[in-house]
Protein backbone atom coordinates (compact mmCIF):
# COMPACT_ATOMS: atom_id res chain seq x y z
CA UNK A 1 0.00 0.00 0.00
CA UNK A 2 2.93 2.36 0.72
CA UNK A 3 4.29 1.66 -2.76
CA UNK A 4 0.94 2.57 -4.34
CA UNK A 5 0.84 5.84 -2.39
CA UNK A 6 4.37 6.67 -3.52
CA UNK A 7 3.40 6.03 -7.13
CA UNK A 8 0.36 8.26 -6.75
CA UNK A 9 2.54 11.00 -5.25
CA UNK A 10 4.93 10.75 -8.21
CA UNK A 11 2.02 11.35 -10.58
CA UNK A 12 1.11 14.50 -8.65
CA UNK A 13 4.46 16.20 -9.41
CA UNK A 14 4.39 18.93 -12.12
CA UNK A 15 5.89 18.31 -15.57
CA UNK A 16 7.08 20.72 -18.27
CA UNK A 17 4.48 22.62 -20.21
CA UNK A 18 4.73 22.48 -24.01
CA UNK A 19 2.60 23.77 -26.86
CA UNK A 20 -0.67 22.10 -27.66
CA UNK A 21 -0.99 20.70 -24.11
CA UNK A 22 -3.91 19.71 -21.94
CA UNK A 23 -3.75 20.92 -18.33
CA UNK A 24 -5.24 18.67 -15.68
CA UNK A 25 -5.62 20.40 -12.31
CA UNK A 26 -5.11 18.18 -9.36
CA UNK A 27 -8.12 17.91 -7.13
CA UNK A 28 -7.56 19.08 -3.58
CA UNK A 29 -9.96 16.52 -2.11
CA UNK A 30 -8.17 13.66 -3.90
CA UNK A 31 -4.86 14.86 -2.46
CA UNK A 32 -6.30 14.93 1.03
CA UNK A 33 -7.70 11.42 0.51
CA UNK A 34 -4.16 10.18 -0.13
CA UNK A 35 -2.84 12.14 2.87
CA UNK A 36 -0.98 14.68 0.71
CA UNK A 37 -0.87 18.46 1.10
CA UNK A 38 -2.21 20.50 -1.77
CA UNK A 39 0.32 23.01 -3.17
CA UNK A 40 -1.51 23.93 -6.37
CA UNK A 41 0.64 21.61 -8.47
CA UNK A 42 -0.54 20.79 -11.97
CA UNK A 43 -0.21 17.59 -13.93
CA UNK A 44 0.35 18.50 -17.58
CA UNK A 45 0.91 16.28 -20.53
CA UNK A 46 0.87 16.66 -24.27
CA UNK A 47 -1.78 15.02 -26.34
CA UNK A 48 0.89 12.72 -27.74
CA UNK A 49 4.00 11.63 -25.85
CA UNK A 50 3.14 13.13 -22.42
CA UNK A 51 -0.28 11.48 -22.41
CA UNK A 52 1.28 8.10 -23.19
CA UNK A 53 3.81 8.60 -20.40
CA UNK A 54 1.05 9.48 -17.94
CA UNK A 55 -1.00 6.45 -18.97
CA UNK A 56 2.04 4.22 -18.49
CA UNK A 57 2.60 5.65 -15.01
CA UNK A 58 -1.07 5.07 -14.14
CA UNK A 59 -0.85 1.43 -15.24
CA UNK A 60 2.31 0.89 -13.19
CA UNK A 61 0.73 2.54 -10.15
CA UNK A 62 -2.40 0.39 -10.43
CA UNK A 63 -0.25 -2.75 -10.69
CA UNK A 64 1.63 -1.81 -7.53
CA UNK A 65 -1.59 -1.02 -5.67
CA UNK A 66 -3.21 -4.26 -6.84
CA UNK A 67 -0.20 -6.28 -5.75
CA UNK A 68 -0.26 -4.60 -2.34
CA UNK A 69 -3.97 -5.35 -1.88
CA UNK A 70 -3.54 -8.96 -3.02
CA UNK A 71 -0.64 -9.44 -0.64
CA UNK A 72 -2.67 -8.00 2.24
CA UNK A 73 -5.61 -10.28 1.42
CA UNK A 74 -3.31 -13.30 1.25
CA UNK A 75 -1.84 -12.50 4.64
CA UNK A 76 -5.29 -12.06 6.19
CA UNK A 77 -6.65 -15.31 4.70
CA UNK A 78 -3.56 -17.19 5.74
CA UNK A 79 -3.82 -15.92 9.28
CA UNK A 80 -7.44 -17.07 9.60
CA UNK A 81 -6.93 -20.45 7.92
CA UNK A 82 -6.45 -22.36 11.12
CA UNK A 83 -6.97 -26.11 11.29
CA UNK A 84 -9.40 -28.03 13.46
CA UNK A 85 -8.77 -27.65 17.17
CA UNK A 86 -7.14 -30.44 19.15
CA UNK A 87 -9.64 -32.99 20.39
CA UNK A 88 -9.99 -32.72 24.17
CA UNK A 89 -11.13 -35.10 26.89
CA UNK A 90 -14.43 -34.61 28.68
CA UNK A 91 -12.74 -33.21 31.80
CA UNK A 92 -10.62 -30.80 29.72
CA UNK A 93 -13.72 -29.44 28.00
CA UNK A 94 -15.54 -29.01 31.31
CA UNK A 95 -12.59 -27.08 32.77
CA UNK A 96 -12.69 -24.42 30.04
CA UNK A 97 -14.66 -21.21 30.28
CA UNK A 98 -17.15 -19.95 27.71
CA UNK A 99 -14.69 -17.44 26.27
CA UNK A 100 -12.01 -20.14 25.93
CA UNK A 101 -14.38 -22.31 23.91
CA UNK A 102 -16.12 -19.57 21.90
CA UNK A 103 -15.10 -19.48 18.24
CA UNK A 104 -12.65 -22.40 18.47
CA UNK A 105 -14.88 -25.21 17.14
CA UNK A 106 -14.44 -27.23 20.33
CA UNK A 107 -18.17 -27.03 21.11
CA UNK A 108 -18.87 -28.97 17.90
CA UNK A 109 -16.45 -31.77 18.76
CA UNK A 110 -17.04 -34.97 20.70
CA UNK A 111 -14.63 -35.66 23.58
CA UNK A 112 -11.91 -38.29 23.37
CA UNK A 113 -10.33 -40.67 25.89
CA UNK A 114 -6.92 -40.28 27.47
CA UNK A 115 -5.60 -43.82 28.01
CA UNK A 116 -7.99 -46.77 28.20
CA UNK A 117 -7.93 -50.03 26.27
CA UNK A 118 -8.53 -50.80 22.60
CA UNK A 119 -11.43 -53.17 23.30
CA UNK A 120 -14.85 -53.24 24.93
CA UNK A 121 -14.11 -54.21 28.53
CA UNK A 122 -17.41 -53.66 30.36
CA UNK A 123 -18.92 -56.51 32.36
CA UNK A 124 -22.35 -57.93 31.45
CA UNK A 125 -25.21 -55.99 32.95
CA UNK A 126 -27.56 -53.07 32.47
CA UNK A 127 -26.13 -49.59 32.10
CA UNK A 128 -27.42 -46.15 31.33
CA UNK A 129 -25.69 -44.42 28.43
CA UNK A 130 -25.44 -40.66 28.81
CA UNK A 131 -23.54 -37.80 27.20
CA UNK A 132 -23.74 -39.71 23.91
CA UNK A 133 -22.25 -37.50 21.20
CA UNK A 134 -22.10 -38.11 17.44
CA UNK A 135 -19.80 -35.88 15.41
CA UNK A 136 -19.90 -36.24 11.60
CA UNK A 137 -16.58 -35.98 9.81
CA UNK A 138 -17.82 -36.52 6.23
CA UNK A 139 -21.06 -36.18 4.27
CA UNK A 140 -21.56 -37.94 0.92
CA UNK A 141 -24.73 -37.97 -1.19
CA UNK A 142 -25.74 -40.68 -3.64
CA UNK A 143 -26.18 -38.87 -6.93
CA UNK A 144 -25.06 -38.76 -10.54
CA UNK A 145 -21.67 -37.27 -11.31
CA UNK A 146 -21.07 -33.93 -12.99
CA UNK A 147 -20.60 -35.60 -16.37
CA UNK A 148 -23.53 -37.14 -18.20
CA UNK A 149 -24.43 -40.84 -18.15
CA UNK A 150 -22.46 -41.54 -14.99
CA UNK A 151 -23.85 -44.17 -12.61
CA UNK A 152 -25.21 -43.27 -9.21
CA UNK A 153 -22.51 -43.11 -6.56
CA UNK A 154 -21.84 -41.37 -3.29
CA UNK A 155 -20.41 -37.98 -4.22
CA UNK A 156 -18.25 -35.82 -1.97
CA UNK A 157 -19.99 -32.65 -0.85
CA UNK A 158 -19.24 -29.21 0.50
CA UNK A 159 -20.70 -28.37 3.89
CA UNK A 160 -22.92 -25.28 3.79
CA UNK A 161 -23.94 -25.37 7.45
CA UNK A 162 -22.00 -23.76 10.27
CA UNK A 163 -20.49 -25.84 13.08
CA UNK A 164 -23.86 -26.82 14.55
CA UNK A 165 -24.33 -30.35 13.18
CA UNK A 166 -23.11 -32.49 16.10
CA UNK A 167 -25.65 -34.46 18.16
CA UNK A 168 -25.06 -34.35 21.91
CA UNK A 169 -26.44 -35.12 25.37
CA UNK A 170 -28.22 -38.24 24.08
CA UNK A 171 -29.09 -40.88 26.63
CA UNK A 172 -30.84 -44.22 26.94
CA UNK A 173 -30.53 -47.76 28.35
CA UNK A 174 -27.43 -49.72 27.33
CA UNK A 175 -27.34 -53.47 27.96
CA UNK A 176 -24.36 -55.82 27.81
CA UNK A 177 -25.31 -59.50 27.48
CA UNK A 178 -23.37 -62.50 28.75
CA UNK A 179 -22.36 -63.45 25.20
CA UNK A 180 -20.70 -60.05 24.74
CA UNK A 181 -23.41 -58.48 22.57
CA UNK A 182 -24.76 -55.01 23.33
CA UNK A 183 -28.06 -53.19 22.87
CA UNK A 184 -28.78 -49.47 22.99
CA UNK A 185 -32.09 -47.60 22.85
CA UNK A 186 -32.17 -43.85 22.27
CA UNK A 187 -34.59 -42.04 24.59
CA UNK A 188 -33.71 -38.36 24.89
CA UNK A 189 -31.23 -35.63 24.03
CA UNK A 190 -30.29 -33.28 21.20
CA UNK A 191 -30.95 -36.00 18.64
CA UNK A 192 -31.40 -34.06 15.40
CA UNK A 193 -29.64 -31.28 13.50
CA UNK A 194 -30.55 -29.57 10.23
CA UNK A 195 -27.67 -29.82 7.73
CA UNK A 196 -27.23 -28.65 4.13
CA UNK A 197 -24.49 -29.84 1.79
CA UNK A 198 -23.67 -28.95 -1.81
CA UNK A 199 -22.93 -31.43 -4.59
CA UNK A 200 -20.10 -30.80 -7.11
CA UNK A 201 -22.65 -29.63 -9.70
CA UNK A 202 -23.99 -26.94 -7.36
CA UNK A 203 -27.16 -28.68 -6.18
CA UNK A 204 -27.81 -28.22 -2.48
CA UNK A 205 -29.16 -31.13 -0.46
CA UNK A 206 -30.78 -30.38 2.92
CA UNK A 207 -31.43 -33.19 5.40
CA UNK A 208 -32.11 -33.77 9.08
CA UNK A 209 -29.18 -35.61 10.68
CA UNK A 210 -30.76 -37.66 13.46
CA UNK A 211 -30.92 -40.96 15.38
CA UNK A 212 -34.40 -40.55 16.86
CA UNK A 213 -35.84 -43.73 18.40
CA UNK A 214 -32.70 -45.69 17.54
CA UNK A 215 -32.57 -49.33 18.66
CA UNK A 216 -29.12 -50.76 17.88
CA UNK A 217 -27.83 -54.22 18.78
CA UNK A 218 -24.92 -56.50 17.93
CA UNK A 219 -21.33 -57.02 18.88
CA UNK A 220 -19.38 -54.03 20.24
CA UNK A 221 -17.25 -53.86 17.10
CA UNK A 222 -20.38 -53.51 14.96
CA UNK A 223 -23.86 -52.94 16.38
CA UNK A 224 -26.51 -51.39 14.18
CA UNK A 225 -30.18 -50.52 14.01
CA UNK A 226 -32.85 -48.39 12.40
CA UNK A 227 -34.02 -44.97 13.49
CA UNK A 228 -36.75 -42.49 12.64
CA UNK A 229 -36.07 -39.61 10.25
CA UNK A 230 -38.71 -36.89 10.72
CA UNK A 231 -39.73 -34.59 7.91
CA UNK A 232 -37.28 -31.74 7.34
CA UNK A 233 -40.25 -29.34 7.28
CA UNK A 234 -43.11 -29.45 9.77
CA UNK A 235 -46.70 -30.05 8.71
CA UNK A 236 -47.57 -26.38 9.34
CA UNK A 237 -44.84 -25.10 7.01
CA UNK A 238 -46.23 -23.12 4.07
CA UNK A 239 -44.59 -23.01 0.67
CA UNK A 240 -44.39 -19.75 -1.35
CA UNK A 241 -47.94 -20.36 -2.63
CA UNK A 242 -49.38 -20.85 0.84
CA UNK A 243 -49.75 -24.63 0.67
CA UNK A 244 -49.03 -26.84 3.67
CA UNK A 245 -49.67 -30.32 5.03
CA UNK A 246 -51.96 -29.37 7.93
CA UNK A 247 -52.74 -25.75 7.08
CA UNK A 248 -52.82 -23.38 4.13
CA UNK A 249 -54.40 -23.85 0.71
CA UNK A 250 -55.23 -27.28 -0.66
CA UNK A 251 -54.65 -26.17 -4.23
CA UNK A 252 -52.79 -23.11 -5.47
CA UNK A 253 -52.23 -23.79 -9.17
CA UNK A 254 -53.48 -21.12 -11.57
CA UNK A 255 -55.19 -23.45 -14.05
CA UNK A 256 -58.76 -23.51 -15.44
CA UNK A 257 -61.42 -25.52 -13.62
CA UNK A 258 -61.75 -29.19 -14.42
CA UNK A 259 -59.60 -30.93 -11.88
CA UNK A 260 -56.29 -30.18 -13.55
CA UNK A 261 -54.87 -29.10 -10.20
CA UNK A 262 -55.16 -32.69 -9.01
CA UNK A 263 -53.28 -34.26 -11.90
CA UNK A 264 -50.40 -36.55 -11.06
CA UNK A 265 -47.62 -34.15 -12.06
CA UNK A 266 -49.14 -31.43 -9.87
CA UNK A 267 -50.40 -33.63 -7.06
CA UNK A 268 -47.02 -33.88 -5.37
CA UNK A 269 -46.85 -30.07 -5.21
CA UNK A 270 -50.41 -29.63 -3.92
CA UNK A 271 -50.68 -32.61 -1.58
CA UNK A 272 -48.02 -31.97 1.04
CA UNK A 273 -46.72 -34.89 3.08
CA UNK A 274 -44.84 -34.61 6.37
CA UNK A 275 -44.44 -38.37 6.76
CA UNK A 276 -41.33 -39.71 8.48
CA UNK A 277 -38.88 -42.16 6.95
CA UNK A 278 -36.25 -44.61 8.16
CA UNK A 279 -32.48 -44.60 8.37
CA UNK A 280 -29.85 -47.08 9.50
CA UNK A 281 -26.67 -46.57 11.51
CA UNK A 282 -23.77 -48.84 12.42
CA UNK A 283 -21.59 -48.04 15.42
CA UNK A 284 -18.23 -49.56 16.36
CA UNK A 285 -16.37 -49.34 19.67
CA UNK A 286 -12.68 -48.51 19.24
CA UNK A 287 -11.60 -47.66 22.80
CA UNK A 288 -12.98 -47.84 26.33
CA UNK A 289 -11.99 -46.68 29.80
CA UNK A 290 -13.89 -48.77 32.40
CA UNK A 291 -12.73 -46.76 35.42
CA UNK A 292 -14.50 -43.66 34.10
CA UNK A 293 -17.17 -45.47 32.06
CA UNK A 294 -16.15 -43.71 28.84
CA UNK A 295 -16.53 -45.24 25.38
CA UNK A 296 -15.49 -43.87 21.99
CA UNK A 297 -15.85 -45.24 18.48
CA UNK A 298 -16.80 -44.56 14.88
CA UNK A 299 -20.13 -44.71 13.07
CA UNK A 300 -21.64 -44.79 9.59
CA UNK A 301 -25.21 -43.74 8.95
CA UNK A 302 -27.31 -43.80 5.78
CA UNK A 303 -30.55 -41.84 5.73
CA UNK A 304 -32.80 -40.03 3.22
CA UNK A 305 -32.58 -36.32 2.50
CA UNK A 306 -35.36 -33.74 2.52
CA UNK A 307 -38.31 -34.34 0.18
CA UNK A 308 -39.72 -30.78 0.29
CA UNK A 309 -42.90 -32.17 1.90
CA UNK A 310 -43.21 -34.91 -0.70
CA UNK A 311 -42.51 -32.80 -3.79
CA UNK A 312 -39.04 -34.27 -4.46
CA UNK A 313 -37.53 -37.73 -4.44
CA UNK A 314 -35.16 -38.18 -1.47
CA UNK A 315 -31.45 -38.82 -1.93
CA UNK A 316 -29.41 -41.22 0.17
CA UNK A 317 -27.01 -39.40 2.48
CA UNK A 318 -24.06 -41.26 4.02
CA UNK A 319 -22.70 -39.74 7.22
CA UNK A 320 -19.46 -40.97 8.78
CA UNK A 321 -17.91 -39.76 12.00
CA UNK A 322 -16.90 -40.43 15.59
CA UNK A 323 -18.94 -40.90 18.75
CA UNK A 324 -18.48 -40.72 22.52
CA UNK A 325 -20.57 -41.92 25.48
CA UNK A 326 -20.45 -42.53 29.22
CA UNK A 327 -21.89 -45.73 30.73
CA UNK A 328 -23.27 -45.73 34.26
CA UNK A 329 -24.33 -48.89 36.06
Curated annotation (Swiss-Prot):
What this protein is reported to do is described as: Stabilizes the manganese cluster which is the primary site of water splitting.
Q: Where does the record place the region Disordered?
A: 258-281
The protein depicted here goes by the name Oxygen-evolving enhancer protein 1, chloroplastic
Supply the source organism's classification.
Eukaryota, Viridiplantae, Streptophyta, Embryophyta, Tracheophyta
Native organism is Pisum sativum
**InterPro entries recorded for this chain?**
OMP/PagP_b-brl (IPR011250), PsbO (IPR002628)
Q: Which GO terms describe its cellular component?
A: chloroplast thylakoid membrane; photosystem II oxygen evolving complex
Q: Which family does it belong to?
A: Belongs to the PsbO family.
For this entry, the transit peptide stretch runs 1-81
Give the GO molecular function terms: oxygen evolving activity
